[in-house]
């Protein structure tokens, strides 16, 4: 919880394990709840049309990237809300992406060989467009409009 602030070991260990198993990213779980990504923030589109990200109260860190794209997603008709994300919720999701200031927006197609919704769908398109618009506007801090 909160290890990105100084204690990187759980994140780097997860990343190393993911690479050894041929994965592109690692997702960190605690007590069957998705907490974070190794160098990104996960965001999933549920069948209710809402994009959910891990809750801060469950141990997730605030995501500058999600904060930056949130208004664009909302404008595209995709509400963004924190939630307690379980593996079963992820597996039934319409779509899942990961976001990070260093990696941008990436679609998640599978987790451990299991297909996750429809990659590069509505959530991916809206998030990517919003992210590119934020980059083009030259934002400097999370508080920039």
Predicted features and spans:
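Helix-start/capping segments and mature chain N-termini
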Residues: 1-145
